[in-house]
């Protein structure tokens, strides 16, 4: 399952018209998720073999820069060899399990300590060295579907993620990217929830393949989803106040009337179409470099060596 604002962080620089202070502040967030093409996941045989790991930092650094010449390498190689007696599939599975464990409780990287970040970077480097899909854009069907953001080192996204520390106001429920390789489109989406409603902010974009690992993304429009109001009021039969039990049964009729009114309002508002805002600017595009890709895990690198780890919807890595 890259920036212009917090969302634009994942791999793109997006500028959109400012319909309102609130809308414009949130529209940039979805533009953040970057991505690259995807190849089919090759069959990994259990036969042991030695692997040479290459650091991909060099490729990632120029994601937003000019496309380098084909013969320009730029990245120092960090060699890591896999034990000859360890099957590649088992080794990759073990690394992914360790990565999942390292990301637990980090809130997409917001709460990660320096030690955890160092561990995550080390695990990512080892996975990149064993990337089963060295040329993602040559097999885009593997990139198809919805990807959920599990971790990022992109600091400009943290203010948005930090809203989750105020559960009484707004909480970021999910940041995702949905890719359609047949139509060459991508949608970045952030879902928010509050005490009385849920909504989403997303961006739609087109992408073009520019190299075996890189794609160019150009955003077309921003979308503010119609708020979905909470239309159910749960009222307990009684509660305790200063040691005294208060019976709320006589109030159920009153709250039932309020709930019916709320349901009517919710249906009316939820039935309205989402607000679409065209993005018409030359700066609403970005590069994305994919450094690891299989059928359940995607790792991308962005400007300033930012890292994005995404899990495929339905993957066991999410649970």
UniProtKB/Swiss-Prot annotation:
Residues 1-20 are annotated as: Disordered. This is Probable plastid-lipid-associated protein 2, chloroplastic. The gene is PAP2. InterPro entries: PAP, PAP/fibrillin_dom. Keywords: Chloroplast, Plastid, Transit peptide. Residues 1-54 form a transit peptide. It is found in: Plastid, Chloroplast. It comes from the Eukaryota. Residues 1-17 have a biased composition (Low complexity). Belongs to the PAP/fibrillin family. GO terms for cellular component: chloroplast. The keyword Lyase does not apply.
């Amino acid at each position: 399952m890259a920036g212009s604002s917090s969302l634009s962080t994942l791999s793109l620089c997006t500028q959109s018209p400012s319909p309102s202070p609130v809308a414009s502040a949130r529209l940039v967030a979805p533009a953040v998720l970057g991505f690259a093409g995807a190849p089919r996941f090759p069959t990994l045989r259990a036969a042991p073999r030695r692997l040479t790991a290459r650091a991909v930092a060099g490729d990632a650094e120029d994601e937003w820069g000019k496309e380098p010449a084909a013969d320009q390498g730029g990245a120092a190689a960090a060699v890591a060899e896999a034990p000859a007696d360890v099957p590649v599939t088992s080794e990759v599975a073990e690394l992914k399990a360790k990565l999942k464990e390292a990301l637990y409780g980090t809130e997409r990287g917001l709460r990660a300590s320096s030690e955890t970040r160092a561990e995550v970077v080390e695990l990512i480097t080892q996975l990149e060295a064993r990337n089963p899909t060295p040329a993602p854009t040559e097999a885009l069907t593997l990139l198809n579907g919805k990807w959920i953001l599990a971790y990022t080192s992109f600091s400009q996204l943290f203010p948005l993620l930090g809203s989750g520390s105020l559960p009484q106001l707004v909480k970021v429920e999910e940041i995702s990217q949905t890719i359609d390789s047949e139509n060459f489109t991508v949608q970045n989406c952030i879902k928010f929830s509050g005490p009385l409603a849920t909504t989403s902010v997303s961006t739609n974009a087109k992408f073009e393949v520019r190299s075996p690992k890189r794609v160019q993304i150009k955003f077309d429009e921003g979308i503010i989803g119609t708020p979905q109001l909470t239309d159910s009021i749960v009222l307990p039969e009684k509660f305790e106040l200063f040691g005294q039990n208060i019976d709320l049964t006589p109030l159920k009729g009153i709250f039932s009337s309020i709930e019916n009114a709320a349901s009517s309002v919710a249906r009316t508002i939820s039935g309205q179409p989402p607000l679409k805002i065209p993005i018409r600017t030359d700066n609403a595009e970005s590069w994305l470099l994919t450094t690891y890709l299989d059928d359940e895990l995607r790792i991308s690198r962005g400007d300033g060596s930012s890292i994005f780890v995404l899990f495929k919807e339905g993957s066991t890595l999410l649970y």
